[in-house]
UniProtKB/Swiss-Prot annotation:
Gene Ontology biological-process entries: anaerobic cobalamin biosynthetic process; methylation
Enzyme Commission number(s) of this protein: 2.1.1.195
Native source organism of the sequence: Rubrobacter xylanophilus (strain DSM 9941 / JCM 11954 / NBRC 16129 / PRD-1)
Pfam hit, one: CbiD
Keyword hit for S-adenosyl-L-methionine: yes
Record-level Gene Ontology MF annotations: cobalt-precorrin-5B C1-methyltransferase activity
Family: Belongs to the CbiD family.
Descriptive protein name: Cobalt-precorrin-5B C(1)-methyltransferase
Enzymatic class: transferase
Length: 388
């Protein structure tokens, strides 16, 4: 095998928070907006007056920091009040940007708070999400934020309230997320750990990858399949049709986090299905594969070319390739089928090492156009439905 490279996860550079020199705006999570709406409705219920502004405290690392929100709509009725706060996700491409987080607060005879879901908020149907099956998909931190915000608005120890959080259009939004696969049906999740949406949701995506692994483990699964996007996931599902949908995880750039979590949760076998670019970076030991944080090591691809029996001239062309795809096209044109196999073997070895040797890992490379396997680590294809 070519010379070993150190396994690493490059840090996120400052450029990830800037676009063309402009600092990107952070935004607010659905949890923060739900807490703000709940507090506005509670204050309206207690005072009998509609609210125009509301202030809430952020959790976690932002604890102590208070932020103000305008109230989009506030209505009162007999024994109830309802308020709406519109989510601003900042410069993050978030499907819930512009969502109307709505809270209806009504009196109840018993002290304390009853928190429930309304239209557009999902319900948990599978274990492994940190919430009971059958519970509203309102995560623990947002739940605490809502309760704390209510305590600031009224004394629920003397007279209790029922709070219903809803998001009009939330069910449609949820179809664009991983919620259906994770077992959250009927709408979006109310999320957030810091109360803040950071640009590009890198932290949120990493957290969702970890959560997806947890769901596989909670359902007694042993096998997980990582892909980098919709196309490679489609290829993976064709290769492994016997696995349940929950086993397939779009890992994006967070392969390292996924395999470490899988090892920690006691899973046994993992597959990585990808194209040349991501595989080339993983073969170099780079576990965080975003293009701004790492470049393809064409010298490694040249070494693999030689190892696979390619000519020195071909190796030099591969080393000068402008992308991993270009290198693969050079291999394909030369009929060097052994090179993708060696690349996948290197990836599987690196992933096993990154998991501390606790996982049986396999890697499969698919063609950019046909999505059919063009290389795999030893024994990988024998475990699939591929009979090409």
């Amino acid at each position: 095998m070519p010379e070993r490279r150190e396994l690493r996860e490059p840090p996120m550079p400052p450029s990830m928070a800037r676009v063309r020199g402009r600092k990107l705006r952070t935004g607010w999570t659905t949890g923060t907006c739900a807490a703000a709406a709940a507090k506005a409705a509670a204050r309206a219920l207690a005072s009998g007056e509609a609210q125009e502004m509301v202030e809430v405290r952020l959790p976690g690392r932002g604890e102590g920091r208070r932020v103000r929100f305008g109230v989009e709509r506030c209505e009162l009725g007999e024994g109830w009040a309802e308020a709406v706060v519109v989510k601003d996700a900042g410069d993050d491409p978030d499907v819930t940007h512009g969502a109307h987080l709505t809270a209806r607060v009504s009196w109840r005879e018993e002290p304390g708070v009853e928190l429930d879901r309304g239209e557009g908020v999902g319900v948990v149907t599978k274990p492994g999400l940190g919430l009971p099956v059958g519970a509203p998909a309102i995560n623990p931190v947002p739940r605490r934020m809502i309760l704390y915000s209510l305590e600031e608005a009224l004394d629920t120890r003397r007279r209790g309230v029922r709070v219903v959080i809803s998001v009009p259009g939330g069910e449609e939004m949820a179809r664009k997320t991983t919620n259906p696969r994770l077992g959250i049906v009927g709408g979006i999740s109310i999320l957030g750990t810091t109360g803040i949406v950071r640009p590009f949701s890198t932290a949120a995506w990493a957290a969702s990858v970890v959560q997806a692994i947890d769901v596989v483990a909670a359902q007694g699964g042993d096998t997980f399949v990582l892909s980098t996007g919709g196309l490679t996931e489609r290829a993976a599902m064709r290769l492994l049709p016997h696995l349940e949908e929950v086993c397939f995880i779009e890992v994006g750039d967070f392969t390292g986090q996924a395999v470490r979590r899988a090892a920690k949760r006691g899973l046994g076998r993992g597959f990585f299905v990808g194209m040349a670019g991501k595989l080339a970076k993983l073969a170099s030991g780079v576990m965080m594969t975003h293009w701004t944080r790492s470049r393809v090591d064409t010298s490694l691809l040249a070494e693999i070319t030689r190892k696979a029996g390619g000519s020195e001239r071909l190796a030099e062309e591969v080393e000068g390739a402008n992308s991993a795809r270009h290198a693969y096209e050079l291999w394909r044109a030369a009929g060097l089928s052994g090179a993708p196999r060696l690349l996948c073997a290197r990836v599987a070895e690196n992933l096993r090492e990154h998991a501390g040797g606790a996982l049986e890992m396999h890697a499969i490379m698919v063609d950019f156009d046909t999505l059919e396997p063009v290389g795999a680590s030893p024994g990988a294809l024998e475990l699939t439905a591929w009979r090409g």
